[in-house]
């Protein structure tokens, strides 16, 4: 299968390129960038010297449609909603890594993203691509989930789908590595600001909140809201999410563990930890895994869920390829079947 990547020079686009090199059935047809349209990729990124024959081309929809079966959009929010339309209309597989098509309510999109919403008919056609819980596996237009949303939803799904928790009890403390802020530098991502530091940001206003709520209320419509905080931590990549919920009735750890194991028994990239073992960011680095650890406090009647992913892989490019594999009926782990980088 031939694919094109629009936004190839951003972190998610670069990760798509890396992962596709390992895929048995996918080859890159064209690469595109808004900021660098006439350069060789290897000139910008020497670590990709093996790809010297891969030029960055101007975005020409007609040319892309002729050369590709699938288009990955690794662009910032606010861009995909316009440039995706020719490829959707032409019947290509389209996987958008931005937030443009995730929210079905256009007013919510405009409130949380502070941009004009995509056209309604395209919003309705997009399938939310939480890979382990895809509703329509034949959909050819995928809104790839956000990194925080992926870690949070995979952590909560077994309990919420069974409606086992108090609807008002969900508290999520999510932390991200610096690459989650993207490639464009800013004061908040400057080395001197992030090194040996931890910063709370977008308190109660992160754009992944409505995305998480949209999916949670599909599973349990009684959930009114979540308390969700995000922090920047001084690591390059990774999402570390700690989730606290109250079960409707006490639950033994063994029962809790069995619930998670059974939910994800056919999910090759979700790994449930043993008792008193809690995942670290390091154990999923550069992989498509989501590792989940569980604890239950009988005294407070609180379940603690620790869910970790690599924000650039499972939280972006890896899940996008996983969604392509599902869509094209490839092996789900094709291009993704490698162990994490350690140490």
Curated annotation (Swiss-Prot):
Pathway: Amino-acid biosynthesis; L-arginine biosynthesis; N(2)-acetyl-L-ornithine from L-glutamate: step 3/4. Its EC number is 1.2.1.38. The active site is at residue 147. Its main location: cytoplasm. It catalyses: N-acetyl-L-glutamate 5-semialdehyde + phosphate + NADP(+) = N-acetyl-L-glutamyl 5-phosphate + NADPH + H(+). InterPro entries: AGPR_AS (IPR023013), AGPR_type-1 (IPR000706), NAD(P)-bd_dom_sf (IPR036291), NAGSA_dehydrogenase (IPR050085), Semialdehyde_DH_NAD-bd (IPR000534). It is found in: Cytoplasm. One of its GO terms (molecular function) is N-acetyl-gamma-glutamyl-phosphate reductase activity. CDD domains: AGPR_1_C, AGPR_1_N. It comes from the Bacteria. SMART domains: Semialdhyde_dh. GO terms for biological process: L-arginine biosynthetic process. GO terms for cellular component: cytoplasm. Keywords: Amino-acid biosynthesis, Arginine biosynthesis, Cytoplasm, NADP, Oxidoreductase. Catalyzes the NADPH-dependent reduction of N-acetyl-5-glutamyl phosphate to yield N-acetyl-L-glutamate 5-semialdehyde. NCBIfam families: argC. Belongs to the NAGSA dehydrogenase family. Type 1 subfamily. HAMAP family: ArgC_type1 (MF_00150). This is N-acetyl-gamma-glutamyl-phosphate reductase. The gene is argC.
């Amino acid at each position: 299968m031939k694919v094109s990547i629009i936004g190839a020079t951003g972190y998610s686009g670069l990760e798509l390129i890396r992962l596709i090199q390992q895929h048995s059935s996918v080859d890159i047809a064209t690469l595109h960038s808004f900021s660098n349209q006439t350069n060789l990729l290897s000139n910008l990124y020497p670590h990709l010297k093996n790809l010297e024959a891969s030029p960055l081309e101007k975005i020409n929809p007609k040319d892309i449609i002729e050369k590709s079966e699938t288009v990955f959009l690794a662009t910032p929010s606010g861009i995909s909603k316009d440039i995706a339309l020719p490829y959707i209309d032409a019947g290509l597989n389209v996987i958008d890594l931005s937030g443009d098509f995730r929210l079905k309510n256009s007013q919510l999109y405009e409130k949380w993203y502070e941009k004009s919403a995509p056209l309604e008919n395209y919003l309705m056609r997009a399938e939310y691509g939480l890979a382990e819980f895809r509703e329509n596996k034949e959909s050819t237009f995928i809104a790839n989930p956000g990194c925080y949303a992926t870690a949070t939803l995979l952590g909560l799904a077994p309990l919420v789908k069974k409606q086992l928790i108090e609807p008002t009890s969900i508290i999520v403390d999510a932390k991200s590595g610096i690459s989650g802020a993207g490639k464009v530098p800013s004061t908040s991502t400057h080395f001197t600001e992030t090194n040996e530091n931890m910063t709370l940001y977008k308190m109660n206003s992160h754009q992944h909140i409505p995305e998480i709520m949209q999916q949670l209320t599909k599973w349990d419509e009684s959930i009114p809201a979540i308390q969700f905080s995000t922090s920047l931590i001084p690591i390059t990549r990774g999402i570390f999410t700690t989730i606290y919920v109250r079960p409707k009735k006490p639950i033994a750890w063994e029962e809790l563990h069995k619930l998670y194991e059974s939910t994800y028994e056919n999910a090759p990239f979700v790994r449930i930890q043993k008792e008193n073992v809690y995942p670290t960011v390091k154990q999923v680095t550069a992989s498509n895994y989501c590792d989940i650890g569980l604890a239950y406090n009988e005294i407070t009647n609180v379940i603690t869920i620790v869910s970790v992913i690599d924000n650039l892989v499972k939280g972006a490019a890896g899940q996008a390829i996983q969604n392509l594999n599902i869509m094209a009926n490839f092996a789900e782990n094709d291009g993704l079947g490698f162990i994490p980088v350690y140490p």
